[in-house]
Amino acid sequence: MNINKIALIYNHNSKHLAIIEEIKKLYNYCKIEEAEVIIVIGGDGELLHNIHRYMHLNIPFYGVNLGSLGFLMNPLDTKKLLQNIHDSTVSILNPLLMQVADTNGQIYTALAINEVSIFRKTNQAAKFRIEVNGIERMNELVADGALVATPAGSSAYNLSASGPILPLESNMLCLTPICSFRPRRWHGALLLSSATIKFEILNTNKRPVNATADFQEFNNITNVTVKSTKDKPVKLLFNKNHTLEDRIIKEQFGG
């Protein structure tokens, strides 16, 4: 991949400003709208926020890890930064499209790279009904919540909720309960990425529920519809010896 124009994004309040200033001195940067690659310095959260902000530009993202985990990031190598980008591999991520309705009758939509989650707002467990492709699959799930995760997001919140890790090219989604109370032994489902999942919230007055698409939250919802969309693909660049697919495989073996 031959790259001549790169843009640099970072948190100006970062504790790593000395490192960032060093990177800035080594290379010439352009405006984000003119870039062939957007470099994001920080952690997974910084990258996700900027993907949401600039994904409409259809420019590949290259993350440089200065955070804690950095699952979607590349290790810092100041001197070889451009060479690593030139030699990088591309992973295509298809986000989730979430549509929610709230108790005031308002309809909202949002995109998620990692997951869409719904969760109880009070100390009482949430109750909801689940449909897949218009067919009722569970008439009542009692739990702290539930989530739908993409393959890229399956090793994040989904894994913490005891959901499975999906290979990046699997064309599947994880439907995972969060602290399921009833049915107690239900651990979720693996669905084709073409599936449309709908959650209908039961008893919304007594058991209010919120929903999030990655970090964007909606309050007091009555129903949520989730499906994968190929209309807004996201291109992430990874070092050739440190691909996202390799990381997902490694994570399954406790790496």
From Swiss-Prot:
Instruction: Spell out the coiled coil positions from the record.
Output: none
Q: Which cofactor does it need?
A: a divalent metal cation
**In its UniProt record, which GO terms are filed under biological process?**
NAD metabolic process; NADP biosynthetic process
Any one Pfam family here would be NAD_kinase
At the top level, the lineage of the source is: Bacteria
Q: What family does this chain come from, according to its entry?
A: Belongs to the NAD kinase family.
Main location per the UniProt record: cytoplasm
Enzyme class of the recorded protein, top EC level: transferase
The cellular component terms of Gene Ontology attached to this UniProt record, alphabetical and capped at eight, are:
cytoplasm
| Gene3D superfamilies documented for this protein | Probable inorganic polyphosphate/atp-NAD kinase, domain 1 (3.40.50.10330), Probable inorganic polyphosphate/atp-NAD kinase, domain 2 (2.60.200.30)
InterPro entries, per the entry: ATP-NAD_kinase_N, ATP-NAD_kinase_PpnK-typ_C, NAD/diacylglycerol_kinase_sf, NADK
Which catalytic residues are annotated? 44
One term of GO molecular function: NAD+ kinase activity
Q: Which reaction does it catalyse?
A: NAD(+) + ATP = ADP + NADP(+) + H(+)
What EC identifiers does the entry list?
2.7.1.23
Binding residues for NAD(+), per the UniProt record? 44-45, 49, 114-115, 144, 152, 155-160, 216
What protein is this chain from? NAD kinase
Q: What does this protein do?
A: Involved in the regulation of the intracellular balance of NAD and NADP, and is a key enzyme in the biosynthesis of NADP. Catalyzes specifically the phosphorylation on 2'-hydroxyl of the adenosine moiety of NAD to yield NADP.
The UniProt entry, under SUPFAM superfamilies, shows: NAD kinase/diacylglycerol kinase-like
Q: Which UniProt keywords apply?
A: ATP-binding, Cytoplasm, Kinase, NAD, NADP, Nucleotide-binding, Transferase
Q: Where in the cell is it found?
A: Cytoplasm
